[in-house]
């Protein structure tokens, strides 16, 4: 990751993808007011560590299980764990039908379950391993709606990878998916054209070697279940990065000899544009633009 923190301060650092939080260790459970003459039920729990300021959550700890009578205000299970570095709070999940669901949050290292109903729609994060082998490294990157967005690997030239909201290096997901989870999808098209550029405007514009695509959401907010991708045209874009002037994209057509603009047009309700090289065609005939820059007045 290349960072510039001042006019002359640049740094290059290695990036580790996934949560920055470590799962709590030594998770254990104990029972209170147990009666051996009554029916027993098995209970299983996992715990995650949370950094409140970022919402970053670790993957689940190892599970702990215990048998007890049916839980109540007096018959309870207590779950304990060791503190995790950097954690502000801890989420506790209980298994029901083989699925761990959220039952509560603790700021300390102990939690009491007195028959709390688990929410199976809120489950612990699942770790994913991305970008760690040859042909799996992304070729283009940008930011959109507080997510880090990657596009195009050699193995998946039309695939988009979006981080969790606000956690730029975390591409973990949950099951079922949360709205803030990482988003991964492939542009479905009749041709395979590599993604070359990602341009954030009010929508995310995806420029490929063969076309222009609009990524948006049903309600305007990107989530794993709301992503929509719509074609805007099929002219394609060259390797040289596009330039954004105001709310208009200036980009090179696929072979690099034609300059086009791309902006939202109310009359067509889509992003469209014109060939700008016709204004001075003699300057570009037989030539390919390799690099360019724009200085705003």
Predicted feature residues:
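Flexible, glycine-rich phosphate/dinucleotide-binding loops
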Residues: 56, 99-101, 157, 221, ...
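Short Gly/aromatic-enriched secondary-structure transition segments
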Residues: 155-168
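N-terminal assembly/attachment segments of tailed bacteriophage virion structural proteins
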Residues: 44-88, 174-188, 197, 217, ...
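Beta-sheet-dominated scaffold domains
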Residues: 140-141, 147, 154-155, 186-297
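Structured loops at beta-to-helix junctions and adjacent beta-edge loops in soluble globular domains
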Residues: 95, 116, 151-153, 254
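Disordered, low-complexity "stalk" and linker segments at domain junctions of extracellular
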Residues: 1-144
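Beta-rich globular "head" domains
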Residues: 146-152, 160-161
